[in-house]
C-alpha cells in the first residue's frame, strides 16, 4: 500500500518502534500474518516489518478519524499491559474505554447495563479480547486489532502487526495511533509539530514500583528536612557560644 508523502514513516518514529521492541514477533506465524514477516532470526524469533506496521497504523487512524462522534469508538484491553494505554487513548481522542474484563453481552444484550452500540472497536489482543470480537461479528461492527504474528485474524478487519505482548510496544502503538488520529482531525496543525504528550504516559506502570518510588521520595524529603534542622541547630549553637564569649569579654 503506497501512502502519500505526508504519511511516510519518519526516522524518529522508526527509532521509537525499534526501541520499544515493536518489531519482535512470535516464533509461530499464522498464515494470514506471513506478509508482515521481515525475516526470522537464528534464535527463531520472527521480525515484523515496521514499515507495514506503520502503513496499517495510518490506515486505522484514517478509519477512526472518519467517524464523526468519537464516543462511537470503543477501545478495549483486557490485557493488563494495555489498560493504561486504552484509558489514555480514550482521554485524548474521546473514545469509550473498556479496560479490564469485557462483560459478555455488552454488544448483543440490550438488557445489560454495560450495553453499547459502537460503530468501531479497537482491541489490544485478538486472543484476550476474543469475546468482544465475537460479539462485534454478530452485530456487524468493524474491528481494528493489534496483532502478533501468531494472533488469530478471524473477524478482524484491520490488523496492525506488532508485538502485542510487551508493555512498551503496546503503549507505543496506542500512542502513535492517538497522535495520528489527532493530526487527521486537525488538533495538531502540522505533522512536523511535536506532540506535547510523551509516549511514557501510555506505558504500563507497576503499582508496587510506584508505591516504592513514592516511599523513596518521601524518605528522601524527610532526610533533607532532618539535615536542614541539624544545620539550623548547629548555627544556633554557634551563635549562642559566640554571644556568651562576647559577653564574658565585655565583662572582663
UniProtKB/Swiss-Prot annotation:
Superkingdom of source: Eukaryota
Listed GO CC annotations: cytosolic small ribosomal subunit
Biased composition (Acidic residues): 223-252
Location of the region described as Disordered in the Swiss-Prot/TrEMBL record: 213-252
Alphabetically ordered keywords of this record: Acetylation, Cytoplasm, Ribonucleoprotein, Ribosomal protein
GO biological process terms held by the UniProt record: ribosomal small subunit assembly; translation
PROSITE patterns in the cross-refs: RIBOSOMAL_S2_1, RIBOSOMAL_S2_2
GO molecular function: structural constituent of ribosome
Protein's cellular compartments: Cytoplasm
Bias (Low complexity): 213-222
UniProt modified residues of type N-acetylserine: 2
Database matches in InterPro entries: Ribosomal_uS2 (IPR001865), Ribosomal_uS2_CS (IPR018130), Ribosomal_uS2_euk (IPR027498), Ribosomal_uS2_euk/arc (IPR005707), Ribosomal_uS2_flav_dom_sf (IPR023591)
HAMAP family: Ribosomal_S2_euk
Family according to the record: Belongs to the universal ribosomal protein uS2 family.
Reported function: Required for the assembly and/or stability of the 40S ribosomal subunit. Required for the processing of the 20S rRNA-precursor to mature 18S rRNA in a late step of the maturation of 40S ribosomal subunits.
Subunit-structure text: Component of the small ribosomal subunit. Mature ribosomes consist of a small (40S) and a large (60S) subunit. The 40S subunit contains about 33 different proteins and 1 molecule of RNA (18S). The 60S subunit contains about 49 different proteins and 3 molecules of RNA (25S, 5.8S and 5S). Interacts with RPS21.
Name of this chain's protein: Small ribosomal subunit protein uS2
Organism: Zygosaccharomyces rouxii (strain ATCC 2623 / CBS 732 / NBRC 1130 / NCYC 568 / NRRL Y-229)
High-level lineage: Eukaryota, Fungi, Dikarya, Ascomycota, Saccharomycotina
Amino acid at each position: 500500500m503506497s501512502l502519500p508523502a505526508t504519511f511516510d514513516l519518519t526516522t524518529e518514529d522508526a527509532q521509537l518502534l525499534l526501541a520499544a521492541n515493536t518489531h519482535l514477533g512470535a516464533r509461530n506465524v499464522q498464515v494470514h500474518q506471513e506478509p508482515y514477516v521481515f525475516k526470522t532470526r537464528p534464535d527463531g524469533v520472527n521480525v515484523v516489518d515496521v514499515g507495514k506496521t506503520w502503513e496499517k497504523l495510518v490506515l486505522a487512524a484514517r478509519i477512526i478519524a472518519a467517524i464523526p462522534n468519537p464516543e462511537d469508538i470503543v477501545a478495549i484491553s483486557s490485557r493488563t499491559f494495555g489498560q493504561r494505554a486504552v484509558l489514555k487513548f480514550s482521554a485524548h481522542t474521546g473514545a469509550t474505554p473498556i479496560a479490564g474484563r469485557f462483560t459478555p453481552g455488552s454488544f448483543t444484550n440490550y438488557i445489560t447495563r454495560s450495553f453499547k452500540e459502537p460503530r468501531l472497536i479497537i482491541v489490544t489482543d485478538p486472543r484476550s479480547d476474543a469475546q468482544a470480537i465475537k460479539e462485534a461479528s454478530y452485530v456487524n461492527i468493524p474491528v481494528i486489532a493489534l496483532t502478533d504474528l501468531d494472533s488469530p485474524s478471524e473477524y478482524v478487519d484491520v490488523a496492525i502487526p506488532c508485538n502485542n505482548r510487551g508493555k512498551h510496544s503496546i503503549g507505543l502503538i496506542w500512542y502513535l495511533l492517538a497522535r495520528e488520529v489527532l493530526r487527521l482531525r486537525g488538533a495538531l496543525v502540522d505533522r512536523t509539530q511535536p506532540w506535547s504528550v510523551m509516549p511514557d504516559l501510555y506505558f504500563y506502570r507497576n503499582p508496587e514500583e510506584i508505591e516504592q518510588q513514592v516511599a523513596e521520595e518521601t524518605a528522601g524529603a524527610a532526610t533533607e528536612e532532618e539535615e536542614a534542622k541539624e544545620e539550623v541547630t548547629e548555627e544556633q549553637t554557634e551563635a549562642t557560644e559566640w554571644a556568651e564569649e562576647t559577653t564574658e569579654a565585655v565583662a572582663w
